[in-house]
Amino acid sequence: MFQGASALTLDAKGRMSVPSRYREALQGQAEGRVTVTKHPDGCLLLFPRPEWEVFRAKIAALPMDAHWWRRIFLGNAMDVDLDSAGRILVSPELRMAAGLEKEVMLLGMGSHFELWDAQTYTAKEQAAMAQGMPEALKNFTF
């Protein structure tokens, strides 16, 4: 179970150091193997390989009228391995798709992660908060 936000930096080669609190879980759950793909909200999704296989099967089973969504998620997916320093390489294509340059935010989302350009994430978070809580959360007690 992944949760929490981490402000990180991509190096000149597009490598990102995975926070140590996640490395052990990724090694145990997926032998350090992850899959990275594009998300239409403007971020990247990072899945431990076993979770990716579950997600991939759901996407592959979508009806024909969702073929573009299959292309978005499956056609842009790249398998990567944690290196010996605990980093993953984010491909130039995926960095460009999500507008990632140097400063990024890694968000634990339960079974997977989202990777955002830090400025984009801050702007979208502020916009969401300005809109107020959605109906589904109005009766939710904290």
Curated annotation (Swiss-Prot):
Entries under PROSITE patterns matching the protein: SPOVT_ABRB
GO molecular function: DNA-binding transcription factor activity; transcription cis-regulatory region binding
GO CC aspect terms: cytoplasm; nucleoid
SUPFAM superfamilies: AbrB/MazE/MraZ-like
Subcellular location as annotated: Cytoplasm, Nucleoid
Keywords on record: Cytoplasm, DNA-binding, Repeat, Transcription, Transcription regulation
Main location: cytoplasm
GO biological process, one term: negative regulation of DNA-templated transcription initiation
Domain SpoVT-AbrB: 5-51, 77-120
Family: Belongs to the MraZ family.
HAMAP family associated with the record: MraZ
PANTHER family: TRANSCRIPTIONAL REGULATOR MRAZ (PTHR34701:SF1)
Subunit organization: Forms oligomers.
Protein name per UniProt: Transcriptional regulator MraZ
Species: Burkholderia mallei (strain ATCC 23344)
Lineage summary: Bacteria, Pseudomonadati, Pseudomonadota, Betaproteobacteria, Burkholderiales
